[in-house]
């Protein structure tokens, strides 16, 4: 049902494939289902994470930000019709993120930022995590595995087909991410999250005590 709400056949097929093969969305729900705080979705794309959370019963306000205008337009159109309390805005996280108090998700976008930009984004996101809130991140981590090589290739294909507006510029390491989040006073863990995909994706789930 969720995929059918997108007018574009390309978007519909993409959503169907993601929901069928990617464990990201039910995993994010498991991380957030006990919270009642507002949610900020940085790099929200088509809004799929927000819409999935709504279907699962997440009731707090959700704000999504992305710099891909066609995706934001499609997401906002669906939100206005079906999902009250869900808002999508055009914006570039490189230029800063709004002050927010709640939980934050950053899914599959960090590799498109240079390392100093990653640090600024993560420090800002961590600052916006309220007491009892969560910061949930998924990204491809840089290591020596075959999965990382496939991840690198896949991201360049996404750019070549214009699905993504930029090519990847810097894949973070686990140590780099954990250091930033822990220095910001958050506590959490890191675990693999690749499901039926060949990509080197990991989930970082952190909270503020």
What do the predicted segments below correspond to?
Residues 1-37, 46-97, 116, 136-209:
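Class I (Rossmann-like) S-adenosyl-L-methionine-dependent methyltransferase catalytic domain
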Residues 119-131:
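A short glycine-rich, Lys/Arg-flanked "PGG" loop and its adjoining helix->strand segment in the class I
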Residues 101:
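Alpha/beta-hydrolase fold active-site loops
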Residues 105:
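A conserved beta-strand element that flanks and buttresses the S-adenosyl-L-methionine
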Residues 108-109:
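Short catalytic micro-motifs in class I SAM-dependent methyltransferases
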Residues 42:
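Conserved beta-strand/loop positions that form the S-adenosyl-L-methionine
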């Amino acid at each position: 049902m969720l995929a059918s709400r997108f007018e574009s056949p390309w978007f519909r097929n993409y959503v169907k494939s993601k929901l069928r093969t990617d464990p990201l969305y039910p995993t994010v729900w498991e991380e957030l289902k006990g919270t009642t705080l507002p949610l900020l979705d940085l790099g929200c794309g088509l809004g799929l994470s927000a819409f999935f959370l709504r279907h699962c019963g997440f009731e707090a306000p959700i704000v999504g930000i992305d710099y891909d205008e066609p995706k934001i337009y499609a997401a906002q159109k669906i939100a206005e019709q079906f999902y009250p309390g869900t808002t999508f805005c055009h914006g570039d996280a490189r230029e800063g993120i709004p002050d927010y108090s709640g939980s934050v998700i950053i899914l599959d976008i960090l590799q498109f930022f240079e390392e100093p930009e990653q640090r600024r984004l993560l420090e800002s996101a961590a600052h916006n995590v309220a007491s009892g809130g969560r910061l949930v991140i998924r990204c491809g981590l840089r290591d020596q595995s075959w999965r990382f090589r496939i991840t690198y290739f896949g991201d360049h294909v996404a750019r070549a087909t214009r699905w993504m507006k930029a090519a990847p510029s810097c894949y973070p390491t686990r140590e780099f991410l954990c250091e930033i989040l822990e220095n910001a006073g958050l506590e959490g863990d890191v675990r693999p999250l690749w499901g039926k995909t060949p990509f080197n994706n990991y989930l970082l789930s952190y909270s503020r005590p």
